Swiss-Prot record:
Enzyme class, UniProt record, top EC level: transferase
Locations listed in the record: Nucleus
Listed GO biological process terms: negative regulation of G2/M transition of mitotic cell cycle; negative regulation of G2/MI transition of meiotic cell cycle
Gene Ontology terms, MF aspect: ATP binding; protein kinase activity; protein serine kinase activity; protein serine/threonine kinase activity
Domain called Protein kinase: residue spans: 8-332
Species per Swiss-Prot/TrEMBL record: Danio rerio (Zebrafish)
Protein name, UniProt field: Serine/threonine-protein kinase pdik1l
């Protein structure tokens, strides 16, 4: 990492995907552990993903315990590197923005461009692996749904639509668990598909205004995508649907096997013969379809069942917004001790 060799020491690679590599690192001065993600900006797709992540995380003016925190971002071209800032006018930054807007490389392809993200280090893997490696626990389910509800309300309050909520993109931090808490801390991460809506002419002082920001790019992971995302006309209510898929799957331990990776994943779906169909796709075809909730348990708390049904409504107007959702999750967890039965 060119500009920060004296500041960070890369320890080991902890993850690798199609867009980049993640390392465990330490801050030399303090010994604190951080995660360093290196994204190679060699294609318009990679550039757009990296910029979206930077724009979303750098737009947040305060920290939230359940949202990954961006310490800094460094942009590197060959041996030249500089710390990025929101709204930068540097030539390196503007070249990447132009590439993202035009959908084609606008800089010298012989140059090696990288974006380095320094973020919280999460030592517990992702939510999917964590839950599936343990027996179901009401305490864990309660803790996780409250943390996720709080995180989503925070993001929407900051005009950020995540657009790819799924257990693989929710990290586990066991080392930073609050004192007295028996459960680990969740961190919503991977903002490569996110959208910041504050620049769309909306009133940033109006908490629910993010739900009036209409988007048209169909993106995300199919088993967590809302019906309207498949159509290409949606708002932040698509995040509510995705969280509904996650919570329902978590409570009942509903899983499926990804065809490409053969990995077992948490996620609710519709069974059609021998095939499993994403909920959003099935509801798009049949908006009046009744979801079989609970699917595996003999019974489910009436308040929880009703909330999941509303979160997974085919009509986004019938879903609670993130602020109502957060309050209802707290109410269910605190007032109804049998919610997970």
């Amino acid at each position: 990492m060119v500009s920060s060799q004296a500041k960070y020491e890369l320890i080991q690679e902890v993850g690798r995907g199609s867009y980049g590599v993640v390392y465990e690192a330490v801050v030399r001065q303090t010994g604190a552990r951080v995660a360093v993600e290196k994204i190679r900006c060699h294609s318009p797709e990679n550039v757009e993903l990296a910029l979206r992540e930077f724009w979303a995380l750098s737009s947040i003016q305060s920290q939230h315990p359940n949202v990954i925190h961006l310490e800094e971002c460094v942009l590197q071209r060959d041996a030249l590197a500089q710390r990025m800032s929101h709204g930068s006018s540097s030539s390196l930054y503007l070249e990447l923005v132009e590439t993202s807007l035009k959908g084609e490389i606008t800089f010298d392809p012989c140059c090696a461009y990288y974006m380095w993200f320094v973020m919280d280090f999460c030592d517990g893997g992702d939510m999917n692996a964590y839950l599936l490696s343990r027996k179901p626990s009401r305490k864990t389910n309660t803790s996780f749904m409250l943390q996720l509800g709080s995180a989503l309300a925070f993001l929407h309050r900051n005009q950020i639509i995540h657009r790819d909520l799924k257990p693989d993109n929710i990290l586990i931090s066991q080392g930073r668990t609050p004192a007295g808490s028996p459960e680990p801390t969740l961190k919503v991460a991977d903002f490569g598909l996110s959208k910041v809506c504050s620049g769309s002419g909306l009133n940033p002082e109006e908490p629910a205004s993010v739900n009036k920001c209409f988007l048209s790019t169909a993106c995300g992971t199919d088993f967590y995508m809302a019906p309207e995302v498949w159509e290409g006309h949606y708002t932040a209510k698509a995040d509510i649907f995705a969280l509904g898929v996650i919570i329902w799957a978590m409570v009942e331990r509903i899983t499926f096997v990804d065809v490409e990776t053969q990995k077992e994943l948490l996620g609710s779906y519709v069974q059609q013969g021998e095939d499993i169909v994403p909920l959003g796709e099935a509801l798009l075809e049949n908006p009046k379809m009744e979801l079989n909730i609970p699917a595996r348990k003999k019974s489910m708390n009436a308040s929880m069942k009703q909330l999941i049904r509303e979160m997974l409504s085919a009509n986004p107007q019938e879903r609670p917004d993130a602020f109502e959702l957060e309050l209802r999750l707290v109410r269910i967890a605190c007032r109804e001790l049998d919610w997970d039965t």
